[in-house]
Amino acid sequence: PIPGAPKENTIMKTVLDAVALVGGENCSPNIVGVAVGGFGLDYTENLARKAIYREPLNSRHEDPQVAALEEKLFTAINNLGIGPIGVGGETTCLGLHMEIAGCHSAVFPIAVTFYCWSARYSRARIYQEGKVEFITHPELKEVIAHG
């Protein structure tokens, strides 16, 4: 989809090498953000972070070629067998989202970032009197109530 982009196998190898390198040290299973392209690595890293937050989890990119690559990467990561916290298993990756950007063909950055399980979020409204209303996970009301 991007003129001058690296071949799909280069992107696959880069992402899989990054996942294998960190193994379970990043509190897997993770959500993986991947960005390809951009005008500098800082931009590409931010784009990868943005990809992590796409909702809903595992929604695919609107470009069918990118969506197909997201699916291939997701499957390939889980086939590495790293598993939760690196002890082995089928679930290393809970989700993978990819973003792309144009860039000069002489420089083509690829960024991979991980969203650790402990960084997952919930939206809540905390009232002055101390009441907590969980917006994204209403079932947490029971956890708070029984402390």
PLM ranges: what are they?
Residues 1-147:
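Non-transmembrane, aqueous-exposed alpha-helical and coiled segments at domain scale
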